[in-house]
Design a protein with these regions (language model features):
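C-terminal motif of bacterial Sec signal peptides marking the signal peptidase cleavage site
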Residues: 17-19
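Cystatin/cathelin-like cysteine-protease inhibitor module
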Residues: 21-138
Length: 138
């Protein structure tokens, strides 16, 4: 009788553990190529946090997000062109940057090569020229 009781208890515990094993509903996978609807604000926030002097930016331009090959994957990318100042308040000259998006959010904004942004269709980006949201702003 005792053996039967132990076997029954083990069976109940096993069923309980199987129920907790995570084989239930799975979280839906995130779509890596959701259109970045808020791309301009994400660029502004990133530039605020990465530029030595995020004030008085001039000649700012941005391209529309476009799906492009990024390594083995396709991702939404934008190109940003601007002339910003260094820590000594001297303009550094116009630079192109490329921004990579994952699931609709900017994950990387780095200097671009001519191959990456040389043929980008830029549009004026006045919001970047008016930028002053950081502790660095004077």
């Amino acid at each position: 009788m005792r053996v039967a009781g132990n076997a029954c208890l083990l069976s109940v515990l096993a069923v309980g553990l199987i129920g907790c094993s995570g084989s239930g509903s799975k979280q839906p996978e995130e779509n890596p190529n959701i259109f970045p609807a808020d791309y301009k604000n994400e660029i502004l926030l990133t530039m605020t946090n990465t530029l030595e002097d995020p004030t008085n930016i001039r000649d700012a331009f941005v391209s529309e997000p476009a799906l492009r090959q990024a390594g083995k994957e396709q991702r939404y990318v934008v190109c940003v062109r601007s002339d910003s100042r260094n820590a000594n308040k001297h303009y550094t000259g116009s630079k192109d940057r490329i921004g990579y998006f994952y699931a609709g959010h900017l994950t990387q904004l780095v200097e671009a090569s001519k191959e990456q942004c040389g043929s980008a269709a830029y549009k004026p980006f006045p919001e970047l020229e008016k930028l002053c949201q950081a502790k660095k702003c004077i």
